[in-house]
């Protein structure tokens, strides 16, 4: 059963993480298509593909995707998947409005702090070789812990990472409401 989360902390710049919903799908699709060269799937994502992805996403309880918000505006998105004792950060994409303001770095700091305090300490990501996001992850406390022909594997370095204290996590159950008598 999918839960919706809102994660907040006293962090500057002030950002919050909010679980994605159906109303975010078009923004997510446009953002990903605008930077598709930085991802393994380089094709154009159409509306039908996005809706199919969203339906499948709802079936994966250990997969979380958030909108990064600042002053009520969408700064971008980022997510993580829990697999085999590790959290894989994925889809870190700034919106056109959110680029270059430090909001995504603050969002990633909040995300990793949340993961480390509520789930696992082993946090990483996989970056396509040549993707300029590698420098972003490096600035945010990740280091290259492995490599393959087409990708770099990065891991969060807890010795240099500065976690924030999570102030609030609101959870709402998005499952279907049971009718009385069932």
Predicted regions and their residues:
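A short beta-loop-alpha structural element at the N-terminal edge
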Residues: 14-30
């Amino acid at each position: 059963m999918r839960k919706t989360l809102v994660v907040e902390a006293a962090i500057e710049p002030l950002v919050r993480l909010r679980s994605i919903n159906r109303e975010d799908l078009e923004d997510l699709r446009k953002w990903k298509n605008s930077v598709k060269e930085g991802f393994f799937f380089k094709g154009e994502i159409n509306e039908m593909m996005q809706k199919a992805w969203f339906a499948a996403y709802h079936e994966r309880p250990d997969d979380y995707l958030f909108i990064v918000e600042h002053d009520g505006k969408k700064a971008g998105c980022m997510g993580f998947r829990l697999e085999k004792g590790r959290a894989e950060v994925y889809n870190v994409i700034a919106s056109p409005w959110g680029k270059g303001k430090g909001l995504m770095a603050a969002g990633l700091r909040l995300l990793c702090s949340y993961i480390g305090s509520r789930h696992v300490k082993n946090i990483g990501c996989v970056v396509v070789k040549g993707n300029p996001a590698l420098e972003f992850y490096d600035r945010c406390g990740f280091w290259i812990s492995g490599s393959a022909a087409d990708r770099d594997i990065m891991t969060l370095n807890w010795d240099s990472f500065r976690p924030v204290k999570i102030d609030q996590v609101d959870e709402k159950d998005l499952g279907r409401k049971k009718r009385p008598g069932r």
